[in-house]
From Swiss-Prot:
Family of this protein: Belongs to the venom metalloproteinase (M12B) family. P-II subfamily. P-IIa sub-subfamily.
Tissues with expression: Expressed by the venom gland.
Additional detail: The disintegrin belongs to the medium disintegrin subfamily.
Pfam families with a match to the protein in the record: Disintegrin (PF00200)
Cysteines engaged in disulfide bonds, as pairs: 6-21, 8-16, 15-38, 29-35, 34-59, 47-66
The protein's name: Disintegrin cerastin
Principal cellular location given in the protein's record: secreted
Length: 73
């Protein structure tokens, strides 16, 4: 929702302050295929294994999202 940096529905999330819906100090992310222990995963880390003729999707190192690369192998 507007103004939220993370989903504050789960108080046990170590990356997100459940009271403010803001990332905790030092956290880059709270969830996502490219988020590990509150930090963005390294660029090139496989976040979605290829199916068929497609290449693996990899993290950018700048976001918790796992972008589709859309390239054939």
């Amino acid at each position: 929702e507007a103004g939220e940096e993370c989903d504050c529905g789960t108080p046990e999330n170590p990356c997100c302050d459940a009271a403010t819906c803001k990332l905790r100090p030092g956290a880059q992310c709270a969830d996502g295929l490219c988020c590990d222990q509150c930090r963005f995963m390294k660029k090139g880390t496989v976040c979605r294994v290829a199916r068929g003729d497609w290449n693996d999707d990899t993290c950018t190192g700048q976001s918790a999202d796992c972008p589709r690369n859309g390239l054939y192998g």
